């Protein structure tokens, strides 16, 4: 073999197919404002109003969020009221005025448990106890859905929307259950373990998706969980 052929061979080895640039899609999850629920009943999918009177809180939220994001909300009014309060804080987040409704981001369906007080629920089903949620992830309330099912529902919507809006910022105003479900999907953890996440009203959870040609479904990074306004600055 000649020296020229060796050089040609070595050069060819260095000429690899370029790897496509990774596309980052950032999800900004916001749990809705506190509901007006003086009797402290299980509300789940109940369409209760939210208390959005804390102006300083929404100023802080507005400062955390990116400009020109796609805004999504569940079908329930408390998520839309929360989005409107964020828009009203500085007028900058124009798309928050009319967020796109995403049915798959609605709260878990608690079936016959919805509307009960906690004492009534205990009397009806003493075995359903869970330290952080209404029931274990696998258990379906009578006439409702399990948290396992909720995770599958939310995961499918996230995958669909991440593909459709790759490279964008997506703000999703939703509920405690769907945000825990999003964490389960991004981290690839069991639904039961995801119930251990604390998700406060008006907190922000950010999940970043990176496309990866070598890994189907891409890679997820958790940038913040349950972050309340006033502790971080908008990027």
Language model feature labels by segment:
Residues 2-26, 88, 108-120, 163, ...:
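Acidic, low-complexity terminal tails and accessory targeting/binding regions
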Residues 27, 69, 168-174:
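Generic beta-sheet signal
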Residues 73-74, 152, 173-174:
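Short beta-strand scaffold positions
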